Regions:
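Active-site gating loops and adjacent loop-to-helix segments of metal-dependent hydrolytic enzymes
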Residues: 68-102, 131, 158-160, 167-172, ...
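His/Asp/Glu-enriched, well-ordered alpha-helical/loop segment
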Residues: 262-265, 269, 309-388, 405
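Active-site microenvironment of metallo-dependent hydrolases
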Residues: 1-21, 26, 31, 36, ...
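Alpha-helical scaffold segments that flank or form the walls of functional sites
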Residues: 72-124, 129-147, 171-184, 438-442
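Histidine-centered catalytic micro-motifs
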Residues: 56-67, 125, 233-242
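Histidine/acidic-residue-rich catalytic or RNA/ligand-binding cores of hydrolases
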Residues: 72, 242-254, 282-287, 304-314, ...
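Metal-coordinating catalytic core of metallo-dependent amide/deamination hydrolases
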Residues: 130-277
Length: 451
C-alpha cells in the first residue's frame, strides 16, 4: 500500500539535516519528499505532526544466536580470561543450538532489533551442531519480523575439517541463493538456479570466519577463494583479545591483518570486528585495503578486552553490538561515554558519522540508497515520538542523538516500504512468540546443563 506521511520533522545523519516535509512512500521507496503534498487515490495518509522520521538504524556486527542466552545457566566455573569466556560460555551455547533454537533466537533478536529502530542487521552466525541451512533458518526468522539482513556463517577449524567445510558450503549456498554469484559464463551452465526464485530484496551474504587464532592458513585461503568467487567481503573478528595477536605472531610470524592480506582474505568490503589490539602495521594494511572496522564498545567492556585504537582507524569505522541486542541508540551512547573516559577527543558528532557509516555500508552491500530520505531512496524508516525540549537543528543533531533520543521513542518502523512496527505494535503476535521462545530456551538451557 502507498503511504503519505504528512507534516513530518525529518532528520538524516549524513549529511546531518533537520527539516519539515511530507513524504510519499510507494513501491518500497521514498517516491517524493516536498512540502504540502496532495493525497492520491488509494494512498493512506498518516499525520506525523510532532513526530520525527529518519532512516532506520543499521547494526554492523551482531550474533542473533545469542538472543536466548539472557539468564542462561552459569558456566561450570567463572572464566578467568577471554579464551575461557569463549570456551565456557559462547562455544558451549553455539554447540547446543539446533534448528528450533536457531529460529527462535533469530526471531526474538530480530523483533527486539526492530523495536529499537534497527532495520538492517549484519549477522555473524555459528551453530556447529546444525550448520547446513542454518542461514536460511535465520533468514526465515528475520523475514517473518520484516527486517533486512546481511548474513554469514562462521568458518573455523575448531570442529575439524568436516565442520569447516560445512561452514564454507553454508556460506556458498546462501550467497548463491541471495543472487550474489557472478553472471554465468560457460555456455553449458544451467540458468535454472536463477529462475528458481526471485532475487531477494532484503537479504545479502558475506563470507563468515571466526578469528585468526581458530583458522589455519588453508582455511583462510578457501575463505578468500569464496570471497573472490562471489565478489564479497569477509566478516571476521580480529584482535578482540591479545590471544589473537599472540597466536598469529607465535605460529605464523605475522600480524593478524597481515595474515588475512597474505592469504587474499582482505578487501574493501571486509568487516573487521573489534580490532582492540591491532598494531600500527596491521591498521595500515587494513586501511590500504579499504576494510571496515566494527567497534563494539559494550561487548568490549563486558569481556574486559580493552579499548580499540579508534583514532588510528580510517573513516570506515562502524558500530556493532556483538550480540548484545541491536539497539544502536544505546550502543552509540555507550560508545560516546567510553570515548570520553578514554580521552579520545571525540564529541557526539563523530558518533553520528559512525552511525551514518553503518548505513553507508548497507547501501554498498545492497546497491541501494539507504540512510537517505531523498526521492528514490529505499523506505527503511523509523518514526520517533521525541519531543525536543531545546531547538533541534542540523548543528546540534548529534547531541540530541546521544543525550535525548533513544529506542523507547521508536513508535513505528518500516522496511522496504512495509510496516514492521506500527504504533508500537509488531506485525506478529508477541505474546505467543515470547511464550514459544521461553519454551525453546528451556530446552536449550537443559542441553547446556548436560555439557
Amino acid at each position: 500500500m502507498p503511504y503519505l506521511f504528512k507534516s513530518a520533522t525529518f532528520i538524516t545523519l549524513d549529511p546531518a539535516a533537520v527539516g519539515r516535509a511530507d513524504l510519499r512512500i510507494e513501491g518500497g521507496r521514498v517516491a517524493e519528499r516536498a512540502a504540502q503534498l496532495e493525497p492520491r487515490a488509494g494512498e493512506e495518509v498518516i499525520d506525523l505532526s510532532g513526530k520525527i522520521i529518519m532512516p532506520g538504524m543499521v547494526c554492523a556486527h551482531t550474533h542473533l544466536y545469542s538472543a536466548l542466552a539472557r539468564g542462561m545457566p552459569a558456566p561450570p566455573r567463572l572464566p578467568a580470561n577471554f579464551k575461557e569466556i569463549l570456551e565456557l560460555i559462547w562455544w558451549r551455547l553455539d554447540r547446543a543450538l539446533d534448528e528450533e533454537t536457531i529460529y527462535w533466537s533469530a526471531l526474538v533478536g530480530a523483533l527486539e532489533a526492530a523495536r529499537a529502530g534497527t532495520t538492517c542487521l549484519f549477522d555473524h552466525h555459528a551453530s556447529p551442531s546444525h550448520i547446513t541451512r542454518s542461514l536460511q533458518i535465520v533468514r526465515a526468522a528475520m523475514e517473518k519480523v520484516g527486517l533486512r539482513g546481511v548474513l554469514c556463517y562462521e568458518v573455523t577449524n575448531r570442529g575439524g575439517r568436516r565442520r569447516r567445510d560445512a561452514g564454507l558450503e553454508e556460506n556458498r549456498a546462501f550467497l548463491a541463493w541471495a543472487g550474489q554469484s557472478p553472471a554465468p559464463a560457460p555456455a553449458d551452465r544451467s540458468q535454472q538456479d536463477t529462475a528458481m526464485h526471485e532475487i531477494p530484496a532484503t537479504f545479502r551474504g558475506m563470507v563468515g570466519a571466526h578469528a585468526s587464532f581458530t583458522l589455519s592458513d588453508a582455511s583462510l585461503e578457501v575463505c578468500a577463494e569464496l570471497m573472490r568467487e562471489f565478489d564479497v567481503g569477509l566478516h571476521i573478528h580480529v584482535a578482540e583479545d591479545l590471544i589473537d595477536v599472540e597466536d598469529a605472531r607465535a605460529r605464523y610470524d605475522s600480524g593478524v591483518i597481515e595474515r588475512l592480506a597474505k592469504r587474499g582474505a582482505l578487501n574493501g568490503r571486509t568487516i573487521l570486528a573489534h580490532g582492540t589490539h591491532l598494531g600500527d602495521r596491521d591498521i595500515e594494511i587494513a586501511r590500504e585495503a579499504g576494510a571496515w572496522f566494527a567497534h563494539n564498545p559494550r561487548s568490549n567492556m563486558n569481556n574486559q578486552v580493552g579499548y580499540a585504537p579508534l583514532a588510528k582507524f580510517s573513516d570506515k569505522i562502524l558500530l556493532g553490538t556483538d550480540g548484545i541486542g541491536a539497539d544502536m541508540f544505546e550502543e552509540a551512547r555507550f560508545a560516546f561515554f567510553k570515548s570520553r573516559e578514554m580521552r579520545l577527543g571525540w564529541g557526539a558528532d563523530e558518533w553520528r558519522r559512525v552511525l551514518a557509516a553503518n548505513q553507508r555500508l548497507a547501501s554498498g552491500v545492497f546497491g541501494l540508497e539507504l540512510g537517505s530520505l531523498d526521492s528514490g531512496s529505499v523506505a527503511d524508516l523509523i518514526v520517533l515520538d521525541y519531543a525536543a525540549p531545546t531547538p533541534l537543528v542540523a548543528e546540534n543533531l548529534a547531541w540530541h542523538l546521544i543525550f535525548g533520543m533513544n529506542s523507547a521513542a521508536v513508535e513505528s518502523v518500516m522496511v522496504n516500504g512495509q510496516f514492521v512496527i506500527r504504533q508500537r505494535r509488531s506485525v506478529l503476535d508477541d505474546e505467543d512468540l515470547y511464550s514459544a521462545a521461553r519454551q525453546a530456551s528451556e530446552r536449550l538451557w537443559a542441553k547446556l546443563r548436560e555439557m
